Structures are given as C-alpha cells and as structure tokens.
Amino acid sequence: MTDLPPLRDVVNRHGLYATKALGQNFLFDEQLLDRIARVPGKLKGENVLEVGPGPGGLTRALLRAGAKVTAIEMDKRCLPALAELADAFPGQLTVIEGDATKIAPETLFDGPWHVAANLPYNVGTQLFTGWLSGQDWPPQWKSLTLMFQLEVAERIVAQPGTDAYGRLAVLAQWRATPRIATRVHRSAFTPPPKVMSAIIHVEPAAMPEGVSARMLERVTEAAFGQRRKMLRQSLKGLPGALDALETLGIDPQRRAETLSVEDFVAIARLLTK
C-alpha cells in the first residue's frame, strides 16, 4: 500500500481551506473515508467518478480500494494535492479541472462507472437529479454513493404520508433503490457544517414499462409544486391529468404527499404519448 502523508498535513502544506462559496467541507477521518469507499462494494478495477474531491480524502480511499478514479475539481487550489495523489497511484487517477454540472460523464468513460462523492452542498441535488433523469435506462452508472445533508438524504428515501416525502423521493425511487448507508456527524467535517450528513447509496432498478421520464417529471413538478393543494387544483394545468385520476380511481381531493410512487408512475403512464 502506498504510504501517504496525513491529509491534514497535505491541506496545511498547500494552504487549503474549505470555502463556503464552493460548498466545501473536508473530511479527514481516514477510517470513515475507507468505510464510505466500501459502500459500493468491490471497486478494484472499476471506473469511479468523483465530484469535488477537494484535497483528496475520499479519493485516497477509492484509490486504496483499487478503483480507477476520474475526479472533477473546479477549485484550482486543490489541483497540486490531487496531482501528488496521481503520482502516488500511477494510472489510477485522472483529474479534470472544471464544473461537474457542465460535464457529461458519458464522455469520460468507455464503459460503466460508479459515482462516489462528498458532493459540494450547493450543487449536490442538481447533480443527483441529473443522474437520475436520463431517458435511457438502465443508465451507464452502476451505483451512486453520495454525501448529502441528512435532511436531503431523508427526502430521497422518504415514504408517502411523511413530511419529507416529495418530488425528490418519487424521482429517486421510481426506477432505482436508494438507501441511507450511514449517518455522519457534523463534527467529522472541517469546518463543521451546521447540520448532520448522511451517505446515500443508489442502484438502478427495472424501468417501469410505458412511462416517459419526462412526463413523470412534469407530473411530480405540478403535484408537489403546490403540495398543500388538492390534486384537482395542482394537476388541473396538466392536460389529461384529471381524467387519469378518474381512470385510476384516485380521489382528486387527495394531496400529492398521500400518493405512492406507483401512483405517480401510473398517472405518468396514462399521460405518456
């Protein structure tokens, strides 16, 4: 195993500090980082996309697990530290300077890949929903292992009838299986955020037949955009939606948070042309 200096020493030597503008919070606990890297299963020889590696804490753990990592980092300050990691693990790490929201992962890999990332808080949900919303399914990614604020993680795995249940839960669960792999105390980060965090692990599931992902997005956007209103109000602007409720025997006086993921899929199926 490659001997590496302590991560804190690397951060101090390169004068790195987490910036709020980039949504950064660094993890230094190597045991925790190794545990996160084990969540996707065996990664030896597997392609892994990491977004926002910062000084390379999780990157180290992924490399130690034998992964072939492609890391996208927009903070120029972190590039020298990542270059040192690339030298320590020849042929295993590729670093791309850029904005992950503007880079299509499909252009980076010849085959399937995993995503493992302590996502910057300010773009985490945007990236996550982007990975979930592809029209082609199953996707080219094999799994997503992502750090989120605990509140967001709970929204991803939420069940109908709960306060956390909403559009994010439906989009995450209708053709994938998300779970909270572990919770992470705020004290594990430098600087400590104001909230707790959690690791979400997602694997693709079978695609329901006859349903357009785009239509499901439209249905959930309308329904949860006015979540306190009855469906007859929130969905009235979506052509055919009220007829779909009648066909399915769904009471239009119900509210969006009472419908199951399967209910939303059924509505979208009837509206898919």
Curated annotation (Swiss-Prot):
The keyword RNA-binding applies. The keyword Kinase does not apply. CDD domains: AdoMet_MTases (cd02440). Its main location: cytoplasm. GO terms for cellular component: cytosol. It is found in: Cytoplasm. It comes from the Bacteria. Its EC number is 2.1.1.182. S-adenosyl-L-methionine binds at N25, L27, G52, E73, D99, N118. Transmembrane segments: none annotated. GO terms for molecular function: 16S rRNA (adenine(1518)-N(6)/adenine(1519)-N(6))-dimethyltransferase activity; RNA binding. Gene3D superfamilies: Ribosomal RNA adenine dimethylase-like, domain 2, Vaccinia Virus protein VP39. Keywords: Cytoplasm, Methyltransferase, RNA-binding, rRNA processing, S-adenosyl-L-methionine, Transferase. It catalyses: adenosine(1518)/adenosine(1519) in 16S rRNA + 4 S-adenosyl-L-methionine = N(6)-dimethyladenosine(1518)/N(6)-dimethyladenosine(1519) in 16S rRNA + 4 S-adenosyl-L-homocysteine + 4 H(+). Signal peptide: none annotated. InterPro entries: KsgA/Erm, rRNA_Ade_diMease-like_C, rRNA_Ade_Mease_Trfase_CS, rRNA_Ade_methylase_Trfase_N, rRNA_adenine_dimethylase, SAM-dependent_MTases_sf. Specifically dimethylates two adjacent adenosines (A1518 and A1519) in the loop of a conserved hairpin near the 3'-end of 16S rRNA in the 30S particle. May play a critical role in biogenesis of 30S subunits. NCBIfam families: ksgA (TIGR00755). Belongs to the class I-like SAM-binding methyltransferase superfamily. rRNA adenine N(6)-methyltransferase family. RsmA subfamily. This is Ribosomal RNA small subunit methyltransferase A.
